[in-house]
UniProtKB/Swiss-Prot annotation:
Alphabetically ordered keywords of this record: Clathrin- and caveolin-independent endocytosis of virus by host, Clathrin-mediated endocytosis of virus by host, Disulfide bond, Fusion of virus membrane with host endosomal membrane, Fusion of virus membrane with host membrane, Glycoprotein, Hemagglutinin, Host cell membrane, Host membrane, Host-virus interaction, Lipoprotein, Membrane, Palmitate, Signal, Transmembrane, Transmembrane helix, Viral attachment to host cell, Viral envelope protein, Viral penetration into host cytoplasm, Virion, Virus endocytosis by host, Virus entry into host cell
Span of the signal peptide: 1-18
Protein name per UniProt: Hemagglutinin
Site (Cleavage): 349-350
Glycosylation sites: 30, 46, 249, 253, 335, 431, 503
InterPro entries: Capsid_hemagglutn, Hemagglutn_HA1_a/b_dom_sf, Hemagglutn_influenz_A, Hemagglutn_influenz_A/B
Organism: Influenza A virus (strain A/Equine/C.Detroit/1/1964 H7N7)
Segments on the Cytoplasmic side according to the record's topology features: 555-570
Protease found in the keyword field: no
Length: 570
């Protein structure tokens, strides 16, 4: 009879515990790994690359007003050597300098060349205004075979002033120009250093020559330095060009007595543009905002590893070739051993017998969402994704890449290393500064991505916990947690019942009576098993006590009858 009761109780126990619902997250082995603040190489379900490495080997100019200077150097557009005749005035938002471009025809150099080049690169083009200078008693048609058009000529925007006749003394002159425009005027002039003293005397007469230039913010005097130099373009002389930015309503004055290359027109800059040095081919079929010497970087990523001197709206240059940004949860798929154990235990304990906790392992095949449910009941087994928790996590993760871009993108200007002798030290400082910035940003990039990855993984774990708590609050005393991410339900729960748990519409009062009855049956079975253990221990103790009492009684009788003697020695 006792055996029959035990069998019935056990059958009831198994029946009650047959219905089960488990929570888990998607997992599928894909080898996608990210680094966080505390760990390296954590596998995640989804991740995106943040470092661009793909280069377009062309200058993408679609939608841009582009000017290709070809053989003309950018500074040549201000002074006008023959190769720049078509670019003396222009409007553009993308200026391309070529390696073959040349700024000058007669040998010489520009003072503070790189600063002037940067100003012109950022301008949206050039427009010019005649300065109105007139001259008497001198020639204004100086020319040279170094600047050939159909014959010997000179810079289109400059006047080479010479004495009326050879060896005649050049008269002292003063010329002034007032900027009446609302924007600054770029004023440029030159100093001619003859190839010899004799040549200087022939061109400008005898005596020392002095040129003085001044405005409200500028004053400097120049003296030519005649002497032999290596011939370039057939010339041993040199022309050095100087410049200033003249504010609106300010006046520039020139005082000179020879060896002066006079400006003919003042230059005014138009708007904004981007200037690049590149020999890459133009392509009007693609659009770009970030350029470098090798072409165009087209990317929505926050970082790039293509060229440290890219300019425009560019991703930050970093030394790392890859920085993966987690856009999904931690990925811990079931391994082969785990799968074999699951298959073996299904035969004995059902679908969920061997599933580890929902944090330790994920489920493969949960393709409709990041989080979901598996259930087992009398109608069978099923799996369903939870869209709300998945969307909540996605909403918080979406925009991480854009936020990184906002933190890192900016308009870059390119400062080349074509420095003259005086500027070489400045160039070294700029190069050192650039390298230091790259080091800092490479570290910052790695840190920013690691912080975001840490937040993503913590966030997705948090959403899993929220989902688990939602189910626990619904089921209350109608179910029991098994410690592995599952709930053993104490009542019959068909597919509609399981759906109500997933949809957060489960009514625990509806099943409360049945669940309590089944819970009592389970507790009774547990209590009977525990009582039996107590009886066994009590029986064992009573038997030992009875055996000891009998032994002591026999000993007492024997001593009393003289059959046993007990001697106590002190």
């Amino acid at each position: 009879m006792n055996t029959q009761i035990l069998i019935l109780a056990t059958s009831a126990f198994l029946c009650v515990r047959a219905d089960k619902i488990c929570l888990g997250h998607h997992a599928e082995s894909n080898g996608t790994k990210v680094d966080t603040l505390t760990e390296k190489g954590i596998e995640v379900v989804n991740a995106t690359e943040t470092v661009e490495q793909k280069n377009i080997p062309k200058i993408c100019s679609k939608g841009k007003q582009t000017i290709d200077l070809g053989q003309c150097g950018l500074l040549g557009t201000i002074i006008g050597p023959p190769q720049c005749d078509q670019f003396l005035e222009f409007s553009a938002n993308l200026i391309i300098e070529r390696r073959e471009g040349n700024d000058i025809c007669y040998p010489g150099k520009f003072d503070d060349e790189e600063t002037l080049r940067q100003i012109l690169r950022k301008s949206g083009g050039i427009k010019k205004e005649n300065m109105g200078f007139t001259y008497t008693g001198v020639r204004t048609n100086g020319e040279t075979s170094a600047c050939r058009r159909s014959r010997s000529s000179f810079y289109a925007e400059m006047k080479w002033l010479l004495s009326n006749t050879d060896n005649e003394v050049f008269p002292q002159m003063t010329k002034s120009y007032k900027n009446t425009k609302r924007e600054p005027a770029l004023i440029i002039w030159g100093i001619h250093h003859s190839g010899s003293t004799a040549e200087q005397t022939r061109l400008y007469g005898s005596g020392n020559k002095l040129i003085t230039v001044w405005s409200s913010k500028y004053q400097q005097s120049f003296a030519p330095n005649p002497g032999p130099r290596p011939q370039i373009n057939g010339q041993s002389g040199r022309i050095d060009f100087y410049w200033l930015m003249l504010d609106p309503n300010d006046t520039v004055n020139f005082s000179f007595n020879g060896a002066f290359i006079a400006p003919d027109r003042a230059s005014f800059l138009r708007g904004k543009s981007l200037g690049i040095q590149s020999d890459a081919q133009l392509d009007n079929n693609c659009e770009g905002e970030c350029y470098h010497i090798g072409g165009t970087i087209i990317s929505n990523l926050p970082f790039q590893n293509i060229n440290s001197r890219a300019i425009g709206k560019c991703p930050r240059y970093v030394k790392q070739k890859s920085l993966m940004l987690a856009t999904g949860m931690k990925n811990v798929p079931e391994n082969s051993t785990h799968k074999q154990l699951t298959h073996h235990m299904r035969k004995k304990r059902g679908l969920f017998g061997a599933i580890a906790g929902f944090i330790e392992n994920g489920w493969e095949g949960l393709i409709d969402g990041w989080y979901g449910y598996r259930h087992q009941n009398a109608q069978g087994e099923g799996t369903a994704a939870d869209y709300k928790s998945t969307q909540s996590a996605i909403n918080q993760i979406t925009g991480k890449l854009n936020r990184l871009i906002e933190k890192t993108n900016q308009q870059f200007e390119l400062i080349d290393n074509e420095f003259n002798e005086i500027e070489k030290q400045i160039g070294n400082v700029i190069n050192w500064t650039r390298d230091s910035i790259i080091e800092i940003w490479s570290y910052n990039a790695e840190f920013l991505v690691a912080v975001e990855n840490q937040h993503t993984i913590d966030l997705t774990d948090s959403e899993m916990n929220k989902l688990y708590e939602k189910v626990r609050r619904q089921l209350r005393e109608n179910a029991e947690e098994d410690g592995n991410g599952c709930f053993e339900i104490f009542h019959q729960c068909d597919n509609d019942c399981m759906a109500s748990i997933r949809n957060n519409t489960y009514d625990h009062k509806k099943y409360r009576k049945e669940a309590i009855q089944n819970r009592i049956q389970i507790d009774a079975v547990k209590l009977s098993s525990g009582y039996k253990d107590v009886i066994l221990w009590f029986s064992f103790g009573a038997s030992c006590f009875l055996f000891l009492a009998i032994a002591m009684g026999l000993a007492f009788i024997c001593i009393k009858n003289g059959n046993m003697r007990c001697t106590i020695c002190i």
